[in-house]
Regions:
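Alpha-helical transmembrane segments and membrane-interface helix-loop junctions
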Residues: 1-176
Length: 176
């Protein structure tokens, strides 16, 4: 069982690092788009290096950056309002944390299922993105994979927390 948890954690960490790379690529895309439009304006249209789909690249980059970050960070700091929890026993707090994380697993599983259905519907209809004319089915499948990882990590972390074995998760915890 420990190898499965380590495999899920390792894959979540890889997705987390890809998420950071996507944020950098989004930034570079925005800078390139603004620079090319400024150059176009400065040269009064004689030098056209603008490209179509910059906003769409950022839109899908942000989608994947967020979805890829979720699996690794699902157990990294839930906000707890001390006003309600400061008098609770540690075992009760552990139960709240575990239940909350497990519910994130359910949420990820439901979204994974919905994105998988959307991918199939998109594949059958041939739906494309608006600017770049990319097929949406593969984008939905990548989203479904990331949400499936969120579900697996939410379930595994939540169950370990409920069982009081959260230290199994933290043995090889690397944040970035």
């Amino acid at each position: 069982m420990k190898w499965l948890i380590n495999a899920i954690d390792g894959l979540a960490l890889i997705l987390y690092r890809i998420s950071g790379l996507l944020l950098i690529l989004m930034m570079l895309s925005v800078v390139a788009d603004v620079a090319s439009r400024s150059l176009f304006a400065l040269t009064q249209g004689s030098l056209d290096l603008t490209f179509v789909g910059g906003i769409e690249l950022v839109k899908y980059g942000l989608l994947f950056a967020m979805l890829f970050a979720f699996p690794h960070t699902v157990d990294k700091g839930q906000i707890v309002v001390d006003l309600f929890t400061h008098n609770l026993a540690p075992s009760t707090l552990r139960w709240f944390d575990g239940f909350y994380t497990f519910c994130f697993g359910i949420f990820g599983a439901l979204l994974c299922w919905r994105f998988t259905e959307a991918a199939e519907a998109s594949r059958l209809s041939g739906e494309l993105t608006q600017d770049l004319l990319l097929p949406l089915a593969p984008l939905y499948l990548v989203s479904a994979f990331a949400l499936g990882m969120l579900a697996l990590r939410g379930f595994s972390c939540g169950i370990l927390e409920l069982m009081g074995e959260k230290e199994l998760m933290g043995k090889k915890d690397v944040t970035a």
